[in-house]
Amino acid sequence: MVCNTNILKDVSTKISAFENVRMIMVEGEMFQVARIHKQLKNRVSAHSSVGATDVVYMTSILEYLTTEVLQLAENTSKDLKVKRITPRHLQLAIRGDEELDTLIKGTIIGGSVIPHIH
């Protein structure tokens, strides 16, 4: 039986790529990749698809943004000498960071208003 080595290399590359994606899914995830995948499939139109690597990428972005906001809110609560993060701390953290302020334009319930001094 003749075996083409290029085909075997392609298959082994695809298997190793799948294993890498799988390892990323397993290691320390804050959000469940399967749940994000299901929600993306429900929201994407019928003519397009959602790949496994797309879901892992989206999940990592969500984890990064969540971690960033929570770290800033934690710093705000520590500055105010409070142990619990409230919506007000989230509001102050997001509005205090220029990039997050442009990214998150929505209203945070219970966040009150940021004072604007002329």
UniProtKB/Swiss-Prot annotation:
GO terms for molecular function: DNA binding; protein heterodimerization activity; structural constituent of chromatin. Not detected by RT-PCR, but promoter weakly active at the margins of leaves and in the root apical and elongation zones. It comes from the Eukaryota. SUPFAM superfamilies: Histone-fold. Core component of nucleosome. Nucleosomes wrap and compact DNA into chromatin, limiting DNA accessibility to the cellular machineries which require DNA as a template. Histones thereby play a central role in transcription regulation, DNA repair, DNA replication and chromosomal stability. DNA accessibility is regulated via a complex set of post-translational modifications of histones, also called histone code, and nucleosome remodeling. It is found in: Nucleus; Chromosome. Its main location: nucleus. Pfam families: Histone. Not ubiquitinated. This is Histone H2A.8. Belongs to the histone H2A family.
